[in-house]
From Swiss-Prot:
Belongs to the SurE nucleotidase family. GO terms for cellular component: cytoplasm. Nucleotidase that shows phosphatase activity on nucleoside 5'-monophosphates. It is found in: Cytoplasm. Transmembrane segments: none annotated. InterPro entries: SurE, SurE-like_Pase/nucleotidase, SurE-like_sf. Pfam families: SurE (PF01975). Binds 1 divalent metal cation per subunit. Its EC number is 3.1.3.5. This is 5'-nucleotidase SurE. A divalent metal cation binds at residues 13-14, 44, 97. The gene is surE. Its cofactor is a divalent metal cation. It is an enzyme of class 3 (hydrolase). It comes from Myxococcus xanthus (strain DK1622).
């Protein structure tokens, strides 16, 4: 049996210099050979964008630590298909994000997108986020990350497995819960201002946070129970519950056919 250390790819969306990334690297370094490929600047809420219409550049910051002038998904793509193509990582981890990636956050999250790109490319992946807005203490999350990654490395994981992990901030978590994705809202705020030349500009976002009380959800685990949420995600976005609703539709001027295999 080979004693070669297991290769772990680390990325994020906050940038290669971020405190959360450093905490995650320090947490998992004893478990294998760590390679960091992360954005060269803040890329929060970049979602799963990839750069198809401009060239990308890679800068080696130090040994096995690279900065990419692209999105989080670009980083995962370049790492797996170029930098590490001859010896692919056995696991990818992303984070630790400076803020939550709960509920609908996953649709916008660059942290989750980096991990998702890894999973799409056949490398099982885990995204880690610290649910806090200030006074980031990454130590509890780093301890959980080390334990979870150690467990993941000790067993064969499905190639496209993707886990989204959220750690409550400001507390020592009371264990963890395997959860479903919840639902929440930030208030859909639009702030309008005017620049010195009289032109309007806008900030979007919102600070009126509310989440729904959904049993078994990631939001309930983190906010109500102060526990780490571990949510398995997948790429199948079909709303199967709506398929029967569409069965009676008829689009004028076009024949309706049954799907293959129905």
């Amino acid at each position: 049996m080979s004693n070669k250390p297991k290769r772990i790819l680390v990325s994020n969306d906050d940038g290669y210099f971020s405190e959360g990334l450093q905490a995650l690297v320090e947490a998992v370094s004893p478990l294998g050979e760590v390679w960091v490929v992360a954005p060269d600047r803040e890329q929060s809420a970049a979602s799963h964008a990839i750069s198809l219409h401009r060239p990308l550049r890679i800068k080696e910051v130090r040994e096995r630590w690279f900065a990419v002038d692209g999105t989080p998904a670009d980083c995962a793509y370049l790492a797996i298909n170029h930098l590490l193509k001859d010896d692919r990582p056995v696991l990818m981890v992303s984070g630790i994000n400076h803020g939550a990636n709960l509920a609908e956050d996953i649709m916008y999250s660059g942290t989750v997108a980096a991990a998702m790109e890894g999973a799409l490319l056949g490398v099982p992946a885990i995204a880690f986020s610290l649910v806090a807005r200030r006074n980031f203490d990454f130590a509890p999350g780093a301890r959980f990350a080390r334990s979870l990654v150690s467990s993941a490395l000790s067993r064969p994981l499905p190639p496209r497995m993707l886990l989204n992990v959220n750690i409550p901030g400001g507390v020592e978590p009371e264990g963890y819960v395997v959860t479903r994705q919840g639902r929440h809202s930030y208030g859909f705020e639009v702030v309008e201002n005017e620049d010195p030349r009289g032109r309007k500009y806008y900030w979007i976002g919102g600070s009126d946070y509310q989440h729904e009380d959904i049993p078994g959800s990631d939001c309930n685990a983190v906010f109500r129970d102060k526990r780490v949420s571990v949510t398995p995600l997948h790429f199948e976005l079909t709303d199967h519950g709506r398929l029967p609703d569409l069965s009676g539709w008829q689009v004028d001027g076009f024949n309706r056919h049954e799907p293959d295999g129905a």
